[in-house]
């Protein structure tokens, strides 16, 4: 992530303009204001503003922003845009990326990882709550296809953009794998941690055959899910 930030830079959550007739204008936000927090989520990139609104579609939000060194809080209720087909709080941001020194690279590299983990966790929430279907999941086949598409689009602008975009994909995949591996499912590290917790609560170890059976069933379920996801990927490609 630090290499990505060093090469691509980072954008800042500074408002470039306020849309007429939306909540941000009514709350008094202005161009030049820097968004610091949305509800309890700290904002470091402008793209986090967009992603937060996506995962909290239509929900009112308390926005903490900075103007001339002073912090202010605005309560904003999103308004539905028929033209765009989604709820908007009514702000625009400048997505131009800036380069930082070594300390900023380390700092924003950590923020980038946090951002990708946030996306992964909230995507899983949408999956488990039914906002996304199992068919929306993507596996190795879809990932390879995406990488191929990104490469073909990036190489037009040069090798530098290929490297930057591949690094971005690598960060996203790493965050996904890290979060998935910590899920409390048998055959994953999260499942092992869960079993250890059960043993601590019970005050004694599980029998080896019981633990082995649990892991075997969990592994079989994971393999079945992988086959389904790969089938889903191939079906999408054929269509």
Sequence positions of predicted segments:
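Alpha-helical transmembrane segments of multi-pass membrane proteins
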Residues: 1, 172-181, 222-229
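Internal alpha-helical transmembrane segments
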Residues: 1-14, 224
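Alpha-helical transmembrane signal-anchor/signal-peptide segments
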Residues: 8-26, 30
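Juxtamembrane transmembrane-helix termini
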Residues: 8-11, 184, 232-239
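Conserved PDZ fold ligand-binding element
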Residues: 25-46, 113
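PDZ-domain C-terminal substructure recognizer with occasional recognition of PDZ-binding tails
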Residues: 26, 30, 36-37, 51-93
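Functional transmembrane alpha-helices
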Residues: 78-177, 194-217, 232-239
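Transmembrane helix boundary and interhelical junction motifs in multipass membrane proteins
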Residues: 183-193
């Amino acid at each position: 992530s630090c290499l990505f930030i060093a090469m691509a830079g980072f954008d800042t959550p500074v408002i470039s303009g306020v849309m007429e007739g939306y909540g941000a204008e009514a709350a008094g936000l202005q161009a030049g204001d820097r968004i610091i927090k949305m509800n309890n989520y700290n904002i470091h990139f402008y793209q986090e503003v967009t992603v937060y609104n996506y995962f909290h579609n239509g929900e009112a939000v308390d926005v903490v922003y900075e103007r001339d060194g002073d912090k202010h809080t605005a309560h904003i209720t999103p308004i539905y845009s028929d033209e765009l087909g989604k709820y908007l709080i009514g702000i625009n941001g400048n997505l131009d990326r800036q380069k930082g020194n070594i300390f900023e690279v380390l700092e924003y590299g950590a923020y980038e990882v946090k951002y990708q983990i946030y996306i992964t966790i909230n995507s899983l929430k949408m999956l488990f709550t039914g906002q996304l279907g199992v068919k929306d999941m993507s596996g190795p086949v879809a990932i390879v296809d995406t990488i191929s598409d990104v490469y073909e689009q990036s190489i037009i602008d040069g090798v530098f953009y290929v490297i930057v975009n591949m690094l971005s994909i690598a960060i996203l995949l790493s965050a996904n794998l890290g979060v998935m591996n910590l899920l409390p499912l048998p055959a994953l590290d999260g499942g092992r941690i869960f079993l250890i917790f059960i043993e601590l609560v019970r005050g004694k170890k599980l029998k080896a055959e019981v633990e082995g059976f649990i892991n075997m069933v969990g592994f079989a379920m994971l393999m079945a899910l992988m086959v389904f996801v790969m089938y889903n990927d191939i079906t999408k490609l054929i269509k």
